[in-house]
Amino acid sequence: MAALQPVRGTHDYLPDEARSHRHVEETARTVAERFGFGEIITPIFEFTDVFARTLGDTSDVVTKEMYTFTDRSGDSLTLRPENTAGVARAFISGGLAQNVPVKLFYRGPMFRHERPQKGRLRQFHQVGVELIGAENPLADVEVIALGSQLLGALGVGGRTILHLNSLGDPESREAYRAALVSYLSGHRDSLSRDSLERLERNPLRVLDSKDEGDRAVVAGAPRLIDHLNEASRAFFAGVTGGLEALGIPFEIDPLLVRGLDYYGHTAFEFVTTDLGAQGTVMAGGRYDGLIRQMGGSQTPGVGWAAGVERLSMLMAADRVGAPRPLAMIPAGPDDEVEALKLAHALRQGGLFVDFGYSGNLGKRMKRANRINARAAIILGGEERANGTVVVRDLDSGEQETIGLAVLEEFLARFL
């Protein structure tokens, strides 16, 4: 029955996947806090104008992928396809401009109506950071360094490569736009319909096309990095010099552009070859005009977002395992309440303790093995009378009788 299946492009995260998912999020939060970033939580839907004004009316996100609906009040609302615009809106409405620079971390679901495939869902999850209010290129370096440290903390840093490019300032992009239009106009017959439309409205988007014919044309296109003015070159040199000083390796990718209109100057991606077509696991850049475009004062910003699902897939070989619990086993029905009390006390002490609710001693032991328990704590009438329990090591099969007064200390060996 179709109604019993998840909606196309969505996914149920059962315990093992959910554990890996949360591990990515919590690791990201920990690393972000190490860099001085505080968590921000924004709504999963915004007024449609928040995205339509900022992402660009020629972007695939706005023209093809947004989940937009009209609510009962007649307002046009959109499930967030990304969160930089939402964070920027919160920066303005929350009055955070008084305290720049502001460092913000976020996590949560995003929504895009894309063709579902491995590593690409219609409801997906991201972690991300935004550093708002710093125009120094070292802010870009710090944001990239945070991303690099996160990948390292997840154990996948050695399987990713940092790609870097400069989109320059508006003056540089305008000079490049003229050169690019001239080149692409000579290859109209080879461009896809989408790219022909982009050529008229926003030619830089042609560089981001995934169409094979477009890619062949783009391979011979002039490079934006060759059209940077002196100020843009100096800014980019500050970024590359900072990365070199921190020992963060990178590759210059002259065709790298961001798919959203608000980016300028630094653009970057951490890419892997281990996930096939969905090789970008983290992407970001600088957006100095976004806050003003949304109605705030001129305020620079830089940030990135990373796909939780893709990072989790990349970590699959090193899947985060569940803590092996201890199994609390009452020997019989008369021992259940006391066993539950003991389990409760051990949990309050920080131990992972499972308690089964039915079955004789043999069936409860089978359950302990099925859940991969590290040890079984057996409590019967004799043990209750003596203030002891029997602790059985389920790996070795050895068991000992232990007094309750020293039980927590004894169980520490199984952690």
From Swiss-Prot:
One of the GO BP terms on file: histidyl-tRNA aminoacylation
Pfam families, per database record: HGTP_anticodon (PF03129), tRNA-synt_His (PF13393)
EC number(s) from the headed UniProt entry: 6.1.1.21
Catalysed reactions, semicolon-separated: tRNA(His) + L-histidine + ATP = L-histidyl-tRNA(His) + AMP + diphosphate + H(+)
Coiled-coil ranges (or none): none
Gene3D superfamilies: Anticodon-binding domain, Bira Bifunctional Protein, Domain 2
A molecular function GO annotation: ATP binding
Similarity comment text for this entry: Belongs to the class-II aminoacyl-tRNA synthetase family.
PANTHER family documented for this protein: HISTIDINE--TRNA LIGASE, MITOCHONDRIAL-RELATED, HISTIDYL-TRNA SYNTHETASE
Protein's recorded name: Histidine--tRNA ligase
UniProt organism field: Rhodospirillum rubrum (strain ATCC 11170 / ATH 1.1.1 / DSM 467 / LMG 4362 / NCIMB 8255 / S1)
Gene name for this UniProt entry: hisS
